[in-house]
């Protein structure tokens, strides 16, 4: 049903939510805990995602924005939100329908993207990660190229091209076109 590592990730999620005395486990708690899961780490590395920045942003969000979930009574168990439950169910159903036996955290990462209105998806998109990137890696092993490197290359090409154009313009400013100086109606000597 679910892998041992995913089970450990879910336990970490519960502990993380409890550490803030939250009554519910949200997708943001789950995503934060998944950043320590080996299956998710492989995906994020392949997609060139800054895991530390993502983790820091999630932790900051949980601290500041989920204060309404605080329950001072320590005897209450932390419960998953409906969105949390849907994501886990979606991942398990998808894995079963594809003929595999166990869902792992990478499958859960794909399922998180179905909860479009969640802050977890927002933070993933802030890091320029989308569902297609994750699915491409999991299904075909296609790693996302570092778009920053591509951008730098395009910028360098543009800069070099502009330098060449400016150089040509400067040459035109200081030189004289002798073809324009010669009269056009004169015959060429034989």
Regions found by a protein language model. Name each.
Residues 1-190:
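Histone-fold recognition with a strong bias for associated Lys/Arg-rich disordered tails
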């Amino acid at each position: 049903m679910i892998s041992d590592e995913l089970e450990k990730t879910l336990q970490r999620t519960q502990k993380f939510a409890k550490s803030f005395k939250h009554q519910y486990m949200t997708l943001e708690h789950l995503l934060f805990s998944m950043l320590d899961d080996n299956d998710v780490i492989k995906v994020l590395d392949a997609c060139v995602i800054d895991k530390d920045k993502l983790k820091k942003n999630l932790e900051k969000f949980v601290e500041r924005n989920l204060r309404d979930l605080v329950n001072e009574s320590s005897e209450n168990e932390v419960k998953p939100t409906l969105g949390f439950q849907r994501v886990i169910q979606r991942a398990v159903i998808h894995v079963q329908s594809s003929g595999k036996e166990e869902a792992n955290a990478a499958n859960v990462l794909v399922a998180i993207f179905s909860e479009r209105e969640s802050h977890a998806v927002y933070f993933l998109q802030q890091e320029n990660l989308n569902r297609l990137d994750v699915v491409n890696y999991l299904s075909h092993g296609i790693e996302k190229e570092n778009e920053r490197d591509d951008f730098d290359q395009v910028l360098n090409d543009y800069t070099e091209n502009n330098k060449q154009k400016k150089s040509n313009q400067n040459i035109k400013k200081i030189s004289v076109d002798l073809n324009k100086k010669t009269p056009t109606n004169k015959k060429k000597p034989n």
